[in-house]
């Protein structure tokens, strides 16, 4: 039986978070403000029959289906919040689980770096696929497990403040988020991202 690591409902995908998703999305590309659900399970191959259930139960579009070394990931979305929730409910029924059975996030690192140096900005930009961080901007970095919570943190941070999505990694052993912008906006975004995870920790 698959173990439910992450079950993340997103009420509205924010534009920058959605665009970054497009850098590694191999399925149907989402649009801004769509509802979405991200599911992470172990072992990884168990995500395949769960995907079958989701796409056959209601009209949702799968954007990501990845089986990696240990875990499997599925993201699907729709203009209809009800359809996304119904597909999620069908998956939970198959697992004999509830959303509360998903693992709670654990924050491993959370740091703000003020006024990034030219060389530091260059090194970050060489390894990222999102917006470029500029010298003198502030940088927020966040690491958590399970990894899928990275998309929730990025999305909630973008709702709260005008920041750039430099990078987020939502698959693998840990998730990571890189955000940049003016220091005041970065601090607001950091609070929003941390609070989103804290709410899941307390659930």
Predicted regions span which residues?
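Flexible, glycine/charged-enriched surface loops at secondary-structure junctions
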Residues: 60-68, 99-110, 163-171, 201-203
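Hydrophobic, ordered structural segments
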Residues: 74-110
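Solvent-exposed alpha-helices and their adjacent loops that cap or buttress functional pockets
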Residues: 28-32, 64-69, 131-134, 158-159, ...
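Surface-exposed interaction/gating patches
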Residues: 122-166, 182
């Amino acid at each position: 039986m698959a173990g439910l690591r992450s079950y993340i409902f997103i009420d509205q995908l924010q534009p920058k978070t959605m665009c970054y998703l497009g850098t590694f999305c191999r399925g149907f590309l989402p649009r801004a403000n769509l509802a979405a659900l991200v599911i992470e399970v172990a072992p990884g191959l168990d995500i395949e029959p769960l995907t079958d259930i989701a796409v056959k139960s209601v009209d949702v579009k799968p954007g990501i289906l990845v089986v990696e070394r240990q875990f499997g990931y599925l993201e699907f979305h729709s203009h209809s919040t009800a359809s996304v929730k119904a597909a999620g409910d069908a998956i939970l029924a198959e697992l004999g689980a509830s959303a509360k059975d998903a693992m709670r996030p654990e924050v491993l690192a959370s740091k703000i770096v003020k006024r990034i140096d030219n060389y530091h900005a260059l090194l970050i930009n060489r390894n990222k696929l999102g917006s470029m961080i500029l010298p003198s901007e502030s940088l927020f970095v966040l690491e958590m497990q399970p990894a899928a919570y990275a998309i929730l943190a990025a999305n909630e941070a973008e709702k709260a403040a005008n920041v750039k999505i430099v990078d987020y990694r939502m698959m693998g052993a840990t998730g990571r988020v890189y955000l940049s912008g003016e220091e005041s906006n970065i601090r607001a975004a950091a609070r929003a991202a941390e609070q989103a995870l804290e709410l899941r920790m307390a659930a």
